[in-house]
C-alpha cells in the first residue's frame, strides 16, 4: 500500500510541476488522477497492483519531462515555460528516423518552402 501512496503523491507533484501556471488544467489533471485511483481501488492481485503503480509512475515521469506550458504573447508568438526537469532532445533520432522511413516520408510540394530554400 505504501508504494501506491508514494506513486500517487509523486503523480500529484508531477501535475504541480507540469501545470503550475494553469490552475484549471491543474485541477482537471488532479480530478482525473483521483478518478484513476478510485477506478483501480478494487484491484486485489499483487501483479495488477504493481502494474498500476508502474503505470502511474510512468505518467508522472512523462508529465514532468515532456509537458511544457506555453503562453501566447501579444506579438502572436508563444513563450514556453521550460523547467529544469524538461527533457530536451537533440533531434538526432528524428533525423535518423526520417532517413529510415524510405517511401513513407512525405514529399515536399512546390508550395511548401523549407528554411533551406
Swiss-Prot record:
Alphabetically ordered keywords of this record: Chaperone, Mitochondrion, Transit peptide
What are the GO cellular component annotations? Answer: mitochondrial matrix
Localization per Swiss-Prot or TrEMBL? Mitochondrion matrix
Q: Where does the source fall among the domains of life? A: Eukaryota
* Record's keyword annotation contains Protease: no
Q: Which GO terms describe its biological process?
A: mitochondrial respiratory chain complex III assembly
Tell me the leader sequence span: none
What CDD domains would the database entry show? Complex1_LYR_LYRM7 (cd20267)
Entry function: Assembly factor required for Rieske Fe-S protein RIP1 incorporation into the cytochrome b-c1 (CIII) complex. Functions as a chaperone, binding to this subunit within the mitochondrial matrix and stabilizing it prior to its translocation and insertion into the late CIII dimeric intermediate within the mitochondrial inner membrane. Modulates the mitochondrial matrix zinc pool.
Protein name in the entry:
Mitochondrial zinc maintenance protein 1, mitochondrial
**Which organism's genome codes for this protein?**
Candida albicans (strain SC5314 / ATCC MYA-2876) (Yeast)
Q: Which gene encodes it?
A: MZM1
